[in-house]
Protein backbone atom coordinates (compact mmCIF):
# COMPACT_ATOMS: atom_id res chain seq x y z
CA UNK A 1 0.00 0.00 0.00
CA UNK A 2 1.41 3.38 -1.04
CA UNK A 3 2.01 5.80 1.83
CA UNK A 4 2.75 9.53 1.90
CA UNK A 5 4.31 10.64 5.19
CA UNK A 6 5.35 13.79 7.00
CA UNK A 7 7.64 13.06 9.93
CA UNK A 8 8.20 15.73 12.59
CA UNK A 9 8.06 18.54 10.03
CA UNK A 10 8.39 22.18 11.00
CA UNK A 11 8.29 25.25 8.79
CA UNK A 12 9.79 28.54 9.96
CA UNK A 13 9.69 31.74 7.90
CA UNK A 14 11.88 34.79 8.38
CA UNK A 15 10.01 38.06 8.89
CA UNK A 16 10.77 41.62 9.97
CA UNK A 17 9.52 40.72 13.43
CA UNK A 18 11.73 37.65 13.63
CA UNK A 19 11.14 33.97 12.98
CA UNK A 20 7.54 32.96 12.27
CA UNK A 21 6.70 29.29 12.87
CA UNK A 22 3.92 28.09 10.55
CA UNK A 23 4.11 24.37 11.44
CA UNK A 24 5.74 22.76 14.45
CA UNK A 25 6.68 19.10 14.79
CA UNK A 26 3.83 17.71 12.66
CA UNK A 27 3.71 13.99 11.87
CA UNK A 28 0.98 12.38 9.75
CA UNK A 29 0.49 9.98 6.88
CA UNK A 30 -1.92 9.21 4.06
CA UNK A 31 -2.28 5.67 2.76
CA UNK A 32 -4.10 4.21 -0.22
CA UNK A 33 -7.85 4.20 0.34
CA UNK A 34 -7.72 6.82 3.11
CA UNK A 35 -9.08 10.36 3.22
CA UNK A 36 -7.12 12.45 5.69
CA UNK A 37 -8.71 15.84 6.31
CA UNK A 38 -6.98 18.80 7.96
CA UNK A 39 -9.24 21.20 9.85
CA UNK A 40 -8.35 24.33 11.75
CA UNK A 41 -8.56 28.10 11.91
CA UNK A 42 -7.20 30.29 9.13
CA UNK A 43 -3.43 30.60 9.37
CA UNK A 44 -2.93 27.31 11.24
CA UNK A 45 -0.63 25.87 8.55
CA UNK A 46 -3.01 23.58 6.66
CA UNK A 47 -1.98 24.86 3.23
CA UNK A 48 1.67 24.84 4.28
CA UNK A 49 1.35 21.16 5.16
CA UNK A 50 -0.21 20.43 1.76
CA UNK A 51 2.61 22.36 0.09
CA UNK A 52 5.14 20.11 1.85
CA UNK A 53 3.30 16.94 0.80
CA UNK A 54 3.09 18.18 -2.79
CA UNK A 55 6.81 18.97 -2.86
CA UNK A 56 6.23 22.67 -3.55
CA UNK A 57 8.52 23.62 -0.67
CA UNK A 58 10.85 21.76 1.71
CA UNK A 59 10.34 21.69 5.48
CA UNK A 60 12.70 23.68 7.67
CA UNK A 61 13.17 20.47 9.61
CA UNK A 62 11.75 16.98 9.44
CA UNK A 63 11.11 14.74 6.46
CA UNK A 64 8.44 14.14 3.80
CA UNK A 65 8.48 10.83 1.95
CA UNK A 66 6.53 8.57 -0.40
CA UNK A 67 7.01 4.88 0.37
CA UNK A 68 10.19 5.78 2.25
CA UNK A 69 11.75 7.82 -0.57
CA UNK A 70 12.32 11.52 0.23
CA UNK A 71 10.07 14.02 -1.55
CA UNK A 72 12.36 16.44 -3.36
CA UNK A 73 9.72 18.24 -5.45
CA UNK A 74 6.40 17.76 -7.23
CA UNK A 75 5.81 14.35 -8.79
CA UNK A 76 3.33 12.47 -10.94
CA UNK A 77 2.51 10.29 -7.92
CA UNK A 78 0.78 13.30 -6.29
CA UNK A 79 -2.04 15.13 -8.06
CA UNK A 80 -3.05 18.55 -6.69
CA UNK A 81 -6.48 20.22 -6.83
CA UNK A 82 -6.72 23.88 -5.79
CA UNK A 83 -9.63 26.04 -4.65
CA UNK A 84 -8.90 28.22 -7.67
CA UNK A 85 -9.24 25.68 -10.48
CA UNK A 86 -6.24 27.22 -12.34
CA UNK A 87 -7.56 26.04 -15.71
CA UNK A 88 -6.24 27.44 -18.98
CA UNK A 89 -9.04 29.39 -20.68
CA UNK A 90 -7.45 29.14 -24.14
CA UNK A 91 -7.78 25.34 -24.05
CA UNK A 92 -11.02 23.38 -24.16
CA UNK A 93 -12.03 20.90 -21.47
CA UNK A 94 -10.31 17.82 -22.88
CA UNK A 95 -7.07 19.71 -23.59
CA UNK A 96 -7.03 21.06 -20.03
CA UNK A 97 -7.45 17.56 -18.64
CA UNK A 98 -4.80 16.12 -20.97
CA UNK A 99 -2.30 18.97 -20.50
CA UNK A 100 -0.10 17.20 -17.94
CA UNK A 101 0.06 14.08 -20.10
CA UNK A 102 1.03 16.25 -23.05
CA UNK A 103 3.91 17.70 -21.02
CA UNK A 104 5.00 14.12 -20.26
CA UNK A 105 5.21 13.37 -23.99
CA UNK A 106 2.13 11.14 -24.17
CA UNK A 107 0.75 10.98 -27.73
CA UNK A 108 -2.48 12.77 -28.64
CA UNK A 109 -4.66 9.69 -29.06
CA UNK A 110 -3.47 8.11 -25.80
CA UNK A 111 -3.80 11.27 -23.73
CA UNK A 112 -7.26 12.04 -25.13
CA UNK A 113 -8.40 8.48 -24.40
CA UNK A 114 -7.22 8.83 -20.80
CA UNK A 115 -8.83 12.28 -20.53
CA UNK A 116 -12.17 10.88 -21.72
CA UNK A 117 -11.94 8.11 -19.12
CA UNK A 118 -11.49 10.53 -16.22
CA UNK A 119 -14.09 12.95 -17.60
CA UNK A 120 -16.59 10.09 -17.48
CA UNK A 121 -15.49 9.39 -13.91
CA UNK A 122 -16.28 12.98 -12.86
CA UNK A 123 -19.55 12.95 -14.86
CA UNK A 124 -18.43 15.36 -17.60
CA UNK A 125 -18.73 13.07 -20.62
CA UNK A 126 -20.03 15.14 -23.52
CA UNK A 127 -18.29 18.35 -22.44
CA UNK A 128 -14.90 17.55 -23.97
CA UNK A 129 -15.01 20.34 -26.56
CA UNK A 130 -16.54 23.05 -24.37
CA UNK A 131 -14.54 26.16 -23.59
CA UNK A 132 -13.80 26.84 -19.93
CA UNK A 133 -15.95 29.99 -19.96
CA UNK A 134 -18.92 27.90 -21.11
CA UNK A 135 -19.12 25.74 -17.98
CA UNK A 136 -20.18 26.43 -14.38
CA UNK A 137 -17.98 26.76 -11.31
CA UNK A 138 -18.80 23.26 -10.14
CA UNK A 139 -18.01 21.84 -13.57
CA UNK A 140 -14.71 23.73 -13.60
CA UNK A 141 -13.77 22.07 -10.31
CA UNK A 142 -14.63 18.71 -11.82
CA UNK A 143 -12.32 19.51 -14.74
CA UNK A 144 -9.59 20.35 -12.21
CA UNK A 145 -10.19 17.04 -10.46
CA UNK A 146 -10.10 15.17 -13.78
CA UNK A 147 -6.82 16.87 -14.67
CA UNK A 148 -5.31 15.71 -11.36
CA UNK A 149 -6.57 12.17 -11.99
CA UNK A 150 -5.35 11.97 -15.59
CA UNK A 151 -1.80 10.97 -14.68
CA UNK A 152 -3.17 8.26 -12.33
CA UNK A 153 -1.41 9.54 -9.18
CA UNK A 154 -1.32 7.48 -6.01
CA UNK A 155 -2.45 10.50 -3.99
CA UNK A 156 -4.80 13.45 -4.44
CA UNK A 157 -3.92 16.60 -2.49
CA UNK A 158 -6.87 18.99 -2.32
CA UNK A 159 -6.63 22.55 -0.97
CA UNK A 160 -10.19 23.63 -0.15
CA UNK A 161 -11.45 22.42 -3.52
CA UNK A 162 -15.09 23.15 -2.69
CA UNK A 163 -14.65 26.40 -0.76
CA UNK A 164 -15.82 28.74 -3.54
CA UNK A 165 -18.94 26.75 -4.49
CA UNK A 166 -22.54 27.46 -3.53
CA UNK A 167 -24.10 25.18 -0.91
CA UNK A 168 -26.03 22.91 -3.26
CA UNK A 169 -23.14 22.48 -5.72
CA UNK A 170 -20.85 21.82 -2.77
CA UNK A 171 -23.07 18.95 -1.58
CA UNK A 172 -23.10 17.43 -5.06
CA UNK A 173 -19.29 17.72 -5.22
CA UNK A 174 -18.86 16.05 -1.83
CA UNK A 175 -20.79 13.06 -3.14
CA UNK A 176 -18.76 13.08 -6.36
CA UNK A 177 -15.48 13.11 -4.41
CA UNK A 178 -16.60 10.07 -2.45
CA UNK A 179 -17.67 8.34 -5.67
CA UNK A 180 -14.25 8.99 -7.23
CA UNK A 181 -12.49 7.82 -4.06
CA UNK A 182 -14.57 4.65 -3.95
CA UNK A 183 -13.87 3.95 -7.64
CA UNK A 184 -10.11 4.63 -7.55
CA UNK A 185 -8.99 3.72 -4.01
CA UNK A 186 -6.54 6.63 -3.98
CA UNK A 187 -5.13 8.24 -0.88
CA UNK A 188 -6.56 11.72 -0.36
CA UNK A 189 -5.34 14.65 1.74
CA UNK A 190 -7.95 17.39 1.87
CA UNK A 191 -8.12 20.80 3.52
CA UNK A 192 -11.44 22.37 4.45
CA UNK A 193 -12.90 25.05 6.72
CA UNK A 194 -16.24 23.24 6.86
CA UNK A 195 -16.65 21.04 9.93
CA UNK A 196 -19.60 19.18 8.41
CA UNK A 197 -17.60 18.49 5.25
CA UNK A 198 -14.67 17.23 7.30
CA UNK A 199 -16.88 14.84 9.28
CA UNK A 200 -18.49 13.50 6.12
CA UNK A 201 -15.35 12.98 4.05
CA UNK A 202 -12.61 12.03 6.51
CA UNK A 203 -11.49 8.56 7.42
CA UNK A 204 -8.97 10.38 9.66
CA UNK A 205 -9.48 13.95 10.80
CA UNK A 206 -6.56 16.10 11.97
CA UNK A 207 -7.27 19.16 14.11
CA UNK A 208 -4.54 21.81 13.85
CA UNK A 209 -3.97 24.48 16.47
CA UNK A 210 -3.70 28.17 15.59
CA UNK A 211 -0.18 29.26 14.68
CA UNK A 212 2.16 27.60 15.19
CA UNK A 213 0.26 24.74 13.61
CA UNK A 214 0.42 21.54 15.64
CA UNK A 215 -1.80 18.49 15.45
CA UNK A 216 -3.77 18.70 18.68
CA UNK A 217 -6.28 15.91 17.98
CA UNK A 218 -6.85 12.99 15.61
CA UNK A 219 -10.24 11.41 15.02
CA UNK A 220 -10.99 8.19 13.14
CA UNK A 221 -14.36 8.47 11.36
CA UNK A 222 -16.41 5.98 9.37
CA UNK A 223 -19.04 8.02 7.49
CA UNK A 224 -17.10 8.04 4.20
CA UNK A 225 -16.64 4.28 4.36
CA UNK A 226 -20.31 3.80 5.14
CA UNK A 227 -21.15 5.71 1.97
CA UNK A 228 -18.58 3.69 0.02
CA UNK A 229 -20.28 0.52 1.22
CA UNK A 230 -23.64 1.68 -0.13
CA UNK A 231 -25.35 3.54 2.69
CA UNK A 232 -27.43 6.46 1.33
CA UNK A 233 -26.11 9.96 2.02
CA UNK A 234 -29.41 10.98 3.59
CA UNK A 235 -29.13 8.14 6.11
CA UNK A 236 -25.57 9.15 7.00
CA UNK A 237 -26.33 12.85 7.52
CA UNK A 238 -29.45 12.09 9.57
CA UNK A 239 -27.51 9.81 11.94
CA UNK A 240 -27.56 11.44 15.42
CA UNK A 241 -23.90 10.47 15.80
CA UNK A 242 -23.02 12.59 12.74
CA UNK A 243 -24.60 15.65 14.39
CA UNK A 244 -23.03 14.84 17.76
CA UNK A 245 -19.51 14.63 16.29
CA UNK A 246 -20.09 17.79 14.24
CA UNK A 247 -21.12 19.81 17.31
CA UNK A 248 -18.29 18.42 19.44
CA UNK A 249 -15.73 19.42 16.82
CA UNK A 250 -17.17 22.93 16.53
CA UNK A 251 -16.80 23.30 20.30
CA UNK A 252 -13.24 21.97 20.18
CA UNK A 253 -12.25 24.40 17.42
CA UNK A 254 -13.80 27.31 19.29
CA UNK A 255 -11.82 26.40 22.40
CA UNK A 256 -8.60 26.19 20.41
CA UNK A 257 -9.24 29.65 18.96
CA UNK A 258 -10.14 31.19 22.33
CA UNK A 259 -6.91 29.92 23.89
CA UNK A 260 -4.72 31.85 21.44
Curated annotation (Swiss-Prot):
<dbReference type="InterPro" id="IPR027417">
    <property type="entry name" value="P-loop_NTPase"/>
</dbReference>
<keyword id="KW-0067">ATP-binding</keyword>
<comment type="similarity">
    <text>Belongs to the ABC transporter superfamily. Taurine importer (TC 3.A.1.17.1) family.</text>
</comment>
<comment type="subunit">
    <text>The complex is composed of two ATP-binding proteins (TauB), two transmembrane proteins (TauC) and a solute-binding protein (TauA).</text>
</comment>
<dbReference type="GO" id="GO:0016887">
    <property type="term" value="F:ATP hydrolysis activity"/>
</dbReference>
<dbReference type="GO" id="GO:0005524">
    <property type="term" value="F:ATP binding"/>
</dbReference>
<feature type="binding site">
    <location>
        <begin position="40"/>
        <end position="47"/>
    </location>
    <ligand>
        <name>ATP</name>
    </ligand>
</feature>
<dbReference type="Pfam" id="PF00005">
    <property type="entry name" value="ABC_tran"/>
</dbReference>
<comment type="function">
    <text>Part of the ABC transporter complex TauABC involved in taurine import. Responsible for energy coupling to the transport system.</text>
</comment>
<keyword id="KW-1278">Translocase</keyword>
<keyword id="KW-0472">Membrane</keyword>
<dbReference type="GO" id="GO:0005886">
    <property type="term" value="C:plasma membrane"/>
</dbReference>
<dbReference type="InterPro" id="IPR003593">
    <property type="entry name" value="AAA+_ATPase"/>
</dbReference>
<keyword id="KW-0997">Cell inner membrane</keyword>
<protein>
    <recommendedName>
        <fullName>Taurine import ATP-binding protein TauB</fullName>
        <ecNumber>7.6.2.7</ecNumber>
    </recommendedName>
</protein>
<keyword id="KW-0547">Nucleotide-binding</keyword>
<dbReference type="InterPro" id="IPR003439">
    <property type="entry name" value="ABC_transporter-like_ATP-bd"/>
</dbReference>
<dbReference type="InterPro" id="IPR050166">
    <property type="entry name" value="ABC_transporter_ATP-bind"/>
</dbReference>
<dbReference type="InterPro" id="IPR017871">
    <property type="entry name" value="ABC_transporter-like_CS"/>
</dbReference>
<feature type="domain" description="ABC transporter">
    <location>
        <begin position="6"/>
        <end position="235"/>
    </location>
</feature>
<keyword id="KW-0813">Transport</keyword>
<keyword id="KW-1003">Cell membrane</keyword>
<dbReference type="GO" id="GO:0015411">
    <property type="term" value="F:ABC-type taurine transporter transporter activity"/>
</dbReference>
Amino acid sequence: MAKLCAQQVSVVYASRRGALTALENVSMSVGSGEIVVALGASGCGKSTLLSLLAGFQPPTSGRVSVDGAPVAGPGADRGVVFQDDALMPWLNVIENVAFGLRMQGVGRDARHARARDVLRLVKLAGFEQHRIDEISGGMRQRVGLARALAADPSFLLMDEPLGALDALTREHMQTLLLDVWRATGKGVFLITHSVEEAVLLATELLILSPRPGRIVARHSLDFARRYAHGEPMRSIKSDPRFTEIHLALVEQLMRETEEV
